[in-house]
């Protein structure tokens, strides 16, 4: 009945364990016989044997209380010349060699039970005392085996997974012996999803490796049968089954999930998996276990990247750029989402040209703006330097640089941010250079333009005291652009009254009511958390002086963080020039209690412009230990204002700080990072360990000309109005007596989100200046209320011949 011809397929390590298994079986079989003599027959799942065809009795299980299995009538006969296996067998080489030559096993009595329906009679139904019993230790490593389901199953295995695999021949065999399968409708699986009896067109799915013992998964598998199960129920299959009749049992009955299995499955699905990483709650509240969350910036960014949601007018512009391929200029007042929309346009265009990344050139008029969007300056892209030469000389200069020529030839879309600071002369020169280099007579050589900026903000830098012309005054503006669009919905300020005041300030036409309201904002604002408003100055000198003065007032040791600069540009002087506009400084000096500003988005709560205070410097190991200790004690990690011990600290706080100091000393060689407590817009707090981030100056082909790795923090006591352009600040202090340029007052005051967070000193309507040409240019946009204005001087898009390949 059982043959061992396929024993050679076993692994060497598995064969070594077989003698031990039989030795253990001999010792336990007598005890098993004594215990079960007056009760039901033991489960066939506890018995072992060899079959050259299959173990189809292992693929399902009876629901009756005796938990018996029925053999197929197609089973092989017993071996004609069995050999006797000694009760005690060593692991000698001779013994293994004898085992390899074995064609069957005989233990003096029938080693396997034969039941009534097997066709072999019932006289052996009680003679199972010497049957082979498989101990749970034999299952230790079998579940790690991975076998192909399409291959013929091995004759016998201690792994329950092997008993579930049926081939086409097994199914046909079961169909011919249908009368013997009336009690075998349940499969031989656990609740984690093993295999039902399925058809030959089964789709193989990788077996999940596990060391879990089968009876630890299903208590009814190797003991008494589950009384809740019926003969028509079957566990859900782990394999993928087609939608046809392949999910039917071979006897024609449908495989269904019984109520207990459903309960188990739903429980396993609903139970959350505990992550080893620290999860960051987003509903932070002040001084609460959730509100004072602690995490590393690198972890948080992977978990929660700020999502970009576009308004209808923003979606319309995105469609005009990506789908309709129009050359456009979109603008809007401060806080209308120009930067958000531009980042989305860049993201979608790069995805569209992902196989040809150099087709999209991302540039900006200034190094700061270019660094913020991951691009390069317009001058660097064009290869024109200061562009003071004639067009012919510029073309000759560009042709000497093969990389620069290739950029011009490969570019399909040219993006220019902060175009308001590009003068008309430079724009016209670049347009002619593009036509000459690309040998294309179409405007800008057939390149699609995406321009954005606000001409009411900072104007082009005048050269040699000569006032520069605005970009919209250039000939290129009239010939190359299809549409001009103005964004109207303000996101930054929710107060309609404040929005109205800022719009009047932008146009340079303030009403008496607005003047009165701005003058009221000269009061001093006191904040309970001790964080000061950020002062905006028109010059870098004033910014450095203010920050230095504040830092000298802090009686703490300074900690210096030096940026790590790299890139394809080897000339340090040139690379430093490229990184000069980067928001991250080359050298950052911090102290405990220093006020800082985050200059990169971390998640939906901690964004560019968030204010915080340095409460200490710790290494990553100390951070992890303190976090775990706080979780175990049910408290907030780093719930104190400083890691240094103060005479005013309570005893329990001192004890925690002493422990922290000990941990820091134990890892004194590790790098210490700033530990910063940030203030959230909703009034809550978040304490994070801030580590290095990277800013790239990147060419369209992906080449990183310059890169800076630095802590994403700056001192927040003061920043320049120029660097504040594009920022959103909750607390702002501005002295308008210092402004000297048109648009500076508007840029500075429009950084604030509310009137409550804005302090204005020396306000005077005379300081509110808007250029008459800019006012006239925007009158057209105001008249159409955000609708696109077509450039009638521009040729239709299809005539430009810019098509996707």
UniProtKB/Swiss-Prot annotation:
Modified residues annotated as Phosphoserine in this record: 80-81
Cofactor: Mg(2+)
Pfam families according to UniProt: PIF1 (PF05970), Pif1_2B_dom (PF21530)
Biased segments, Low complexity type: 245-257
Biased segments, Polar residues type: 66-83, 230-244, 268-282
InterPro entries registered for this protein in UniProt: AAA+_ATPase (IPR003593), DNA_helicase_pif1-like_DEAD (IPR010285), P-loop_NTPase (IPR027417), Pif1-like_2B_dom (IPR049163), PIF1_helicase (IPR051055), PIF1_RRM3_pfh1 (IPR048293)
Database matches in CDD domains: DEXSc_Pif1_like, SF1_C_RecD
Residue ranges for the DNA-binding region feature of this UniProt entry: 744-763
Record has Zinc-finger as a keyword: no
Binding positions (ATP): 332-339
Transit peptide per record: 1-25
GO biological process: DNA recombination; DNA strand elongation involved in mitotic DNA replication; mitochondrial DNA repair; mitochondrial genome maintenance; mitotic recombination-dependent replication fork processing; removal of RNA primer involved in mitotic DNA replication; replication fork processing; replication fork reversal
Gene Ontology MF annotations: 5'-3' DNA helicase activity; 5'-3' DNA/RNA helicase activity; ATP binding; ATP hydrolysis activity; ATP-dependent protein-DNA complex displacement activity; DNA/DNA annealing activity; flap-structured DNA binding; G-quadruplex DNA binding
Outcome (variant: residue 338 to E): Abolishes ATPase and DNA unwinding activities
The keyword DNA-binding belongs to this UniProt entry's keyword annotation: yes
Outcome, altering residue 1 to A: In pfh1-m1; localizes exclusively to nucleus, loss of mitochondrial function
Annotated catalysed reactions: Couples ATP hydrolysis with the unwinding of duplex DNA at the replication fork by translocating in the 5'-3' direction. This creates two antiparallel DNA single strands (ssDNA). The leading ssDNA polymer is the template for DNA polymerase III holoenzyme which synthesizes a continuous strand; ATP + H2O = ADP + phosphate + H(+)
Region (Disordered), start-end ranges: 58-91, 217-282
Keywords annotated in UniProt: ATP-binding, DNA damage, DNA recombination, DNA repair, DNA-binding, Helicase, Hydrolase, Isomerase, Mitochondrion, Nucleotide-binding, Nucleus, Phosphoprotein, Transit peptide
Entries under HAMAP family matching the protein: PIF1 (MF_03176)
Matching PANTHER family: ATP-DEPENDENT DNA HELICASE
Similarity remark: Belongs to the helicase family. PIF1 subfamily.
Entry function: DNA-dependent ATPase and 5'-3' DNA helicase required for the maintenance of both mitochondrial and nuclear genome stability. Involved in the maintenance of mitochondrial (mtDNA). Required for both repair of mitochondrial DNA and recognition of a recombinogenic signal characterized by a 26-bp palindromic at sequence in the ery region of mitochondrial DNA. May have a general role in chromosomal replication by affecting Okazaki fragment maturation. Required for the completion of S-phase.
Name the UniProt record assigns to this protein: ATP-dependent DNA helicase pfh1
Organism expressing this protein natively: Schizosaccharomyces pombe (strain 972 / ATCC 24843)
């Amino acid at each position: 009945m059982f043959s061992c011809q396929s024993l050679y397929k076993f692994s060497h390590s598995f064969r070594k364990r077989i003698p031990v298994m039989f030795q253990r079986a001999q010792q336990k079989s007598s005890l098993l016989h004594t215990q079960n003599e007056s009760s039901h027959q033991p489960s066939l799942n506890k018995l072992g044997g060899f079959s050259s065809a299959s173990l189809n009795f292992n693929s399902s299980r009876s629901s009756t209380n005796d938990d018996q299995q029925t053999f197929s009538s197609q089973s092989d006969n017993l071996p004609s010349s069995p050999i006797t296996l000694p009760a005690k067998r060593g692991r000698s080489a001779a013994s293994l060699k004898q085992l390899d030559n074995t064609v069957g096993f005989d233990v003096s009595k029938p080693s396997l039970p034969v039941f009534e329906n097997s066709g072999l009679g019932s006289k052996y139904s009680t003679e199972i005392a010497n049957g082979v019993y498989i101990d749970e230790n034999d299952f230790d490593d079998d579940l790690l085996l991975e076998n192909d389901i399409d291959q013929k199953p091995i004759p016998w295995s201690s792994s329950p997974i092997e008993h579930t695999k049926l081939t086409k021949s097994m199914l046909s065999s079961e169909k011919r012996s249908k009368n013997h399968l009336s009690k075998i409708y349940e499969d031989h699986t656990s609740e984690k999803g093993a295999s039902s009896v399925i058809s030959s067109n089964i789709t193989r799915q990788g077996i999940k490796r596990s060391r879990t013992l089968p009876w630890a998964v299903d208590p009814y598998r190797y003991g008494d049968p589950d009384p809740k199960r019926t003969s028509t129920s079957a566990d859900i299959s782990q394999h993928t089954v087609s939608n046809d009749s392949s999910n039917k049992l071979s006897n024609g009955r449908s495989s269904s999930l019984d109520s207990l299995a459903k309960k188990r499955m739903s429980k396993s699905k609903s139970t959350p998996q505990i992550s080893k990483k620290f999860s960051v709650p987003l509903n932070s509240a002040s001084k609460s276990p959730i509100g004072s969350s602690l995490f590393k910036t690198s972890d948080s960014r992977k978990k929660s990247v700020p999502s970009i949601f576009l308004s209808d007018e923003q979606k319309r512009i995105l469609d005009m750029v990506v789908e309709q391929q129009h050359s456009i200029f979109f603008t809007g007042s401060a806080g209308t989402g120009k930067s958000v929309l531009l980042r989305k346009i860049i993201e979608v265009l790069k995805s569209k040209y992902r196989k040809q990344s150099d087709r999209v050139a991302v540039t900006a008029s200034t190094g700061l703006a270019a660094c913020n969007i991951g691009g390069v300056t317009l001058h660097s892209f064009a290869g024109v330097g200061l562009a003071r030469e004639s067009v012919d000389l510029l073309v000759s200069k560009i042709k000497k640089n093969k990389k620069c020529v290739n950029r011009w030839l490969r570019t399909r879309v040219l993006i220019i941010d902060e175009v308001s600071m590009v003068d008309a002369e430079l724009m016209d020169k670049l347009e002619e250079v593009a036509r000459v280099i690309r040998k294309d007579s179409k405007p800008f050589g057939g390149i699609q333009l995406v321009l954005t900026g606000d001409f009411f903000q900072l104007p082009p830098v005048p050269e040699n005291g000569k006032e520069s012309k605005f970009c919209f005054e250039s000939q290129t503006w009239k010939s190359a652009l299809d549409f001009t669009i103005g964004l109207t919905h303000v996101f930054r300020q929710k107060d309609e009254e404040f929005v109205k005041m800022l719009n009047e300030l932008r146009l340079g036409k303030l009403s008496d009511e607005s003047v009165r309201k701005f003058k009221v904002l000269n009061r001093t604002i006191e904040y309970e958390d001790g964080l000061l408003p950020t002062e905006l100055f028109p010059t870098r000198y004033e910014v450095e002086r203010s920050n230095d003065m504040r830092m000298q007032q802090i009686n703490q040791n300074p900690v210096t963080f030096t940026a790590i600069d790299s890139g394809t540009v080897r000339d340090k002087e040139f690379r430093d020039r490229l990184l000069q506009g980067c928001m991250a400084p080359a050298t950052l000096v911090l102290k405990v209690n220093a006020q800082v500003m985050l200059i990169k988005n971390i998640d939906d709560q901690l964004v560019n412009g968030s204010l915080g205070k340095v409460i200490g410097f710790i290494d990553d190991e100390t951070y992890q230990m303190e976090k775990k200790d706080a979780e175990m004690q049910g408290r907030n990690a780093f719930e104190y204002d400083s890691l240094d011990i103060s005479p005013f600290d309570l005893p329990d706080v001192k004890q925690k700080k002493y422990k922290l100091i000990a941990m820091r000393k134990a890892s004194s060689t590790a790098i210490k990072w700033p530990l910063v407590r940030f203030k959230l817009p909703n009034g809550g707090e978040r304490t994070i360990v801030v580590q290095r981030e990277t800013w790239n100056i990147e060419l369209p082909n992906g080449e990183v000309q310059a890169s800076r790795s630095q802590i994403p923090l700056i001192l927040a006591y003061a920043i320049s109005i120029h660097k504040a352009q594009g920022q959103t600040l909750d607390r702002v202090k501005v002295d308008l007596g210092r402004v000297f340029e048109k648009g500076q007052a508007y840029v500075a005051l429009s950084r604030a989100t509310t009137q409550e967070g804005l302090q204005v000193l020396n306000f005077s309507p005379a300081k509110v200046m808007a250029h008459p040409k800019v006012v006239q240019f925007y009158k057209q946009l105001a008249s159409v209320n955000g609708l696109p204005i077509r450039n009638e001087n521009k040729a239709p898009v299809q005539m430009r011949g810019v098509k996707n390949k």
